[in-house]
Each structure stands twice: as C-alpha cells, then as structure tokens.
Amino acid sequence: MDVKIELSSYVRVLKLASTPSWNEFSQIGLIAGAGIVFVGFLGFLIFAIMTLLPGGV
C-alpha cells in the first residue's frame, strides 16, 4: 500500500466537499429525526403486540 497515493485521494475528496447550506442541513436533520421516530414507533408497536399475545412479556 502506498500511503502517499491514499492520502492524496483523501485530500482530493476533502477539497471537493463543501459544507451544506442551512436548508440542506435542516432537511437532513428532519429526515433523520423522522426515521428515529419511525423506528421507535415500530419498536413500541412490536412490544404492544407481544404484550397482548398470551404468554407475552
């Protein structure tokens, strides 16, 4: 492995990257938050179903 070649490719990617605008950042946060809420709701739904079944938790 040639470390200089790998480092130069990493530097090239970092130079191309830019910071997101506020709208893009808030949209990413909103989508990530919605995903977290969805997974939590799904877990709660599974827990509720397992509790209602005979011999559940």
Swiss-Prot record:
GO CC terms: plasma membrane
Record-level GO BP terms: intracellular protein transmembrane transport; protein secretion; protein targeting
Transmembrane segments: 30-50
Signal peptide: none
Subcellular location: Cell membrane
Keywords: Cell membrane, Membrane, Protein transport, Translocation, Transmembrane, Transmembrane helix, Transport
GO molecular-function terms, A-Z: protein transmembrane transporter activity
Membrane topology, as annotated: Single-pass membrane protein
Function description: Essential subunit of the Sec protein translocation channel SecYEG. Clamps together the 2 halves of SecY. May contact the channel plug during translocation.
Family: Belongs to the SecE/SEC61-gamma family.
Subunit structure: Component of the Sec protein translocase complex. Heterotrimer consisting of SecY (alpha), SecG (beta) and SecE (gamma) subunits. The heterotrimers can form oligomers, although 1 heterotrimer is thought to be able to translocate proteins. Interacts with the ribosome. May interact with SecDF, and other proteins may be involved.
HAMAP family: SecE
Protein name: Protein translocase subunit SecE
Organism (species): Haloquadratum walsbyi (strain DSM 16790 / HBSQ001)
The encoding gene: secE
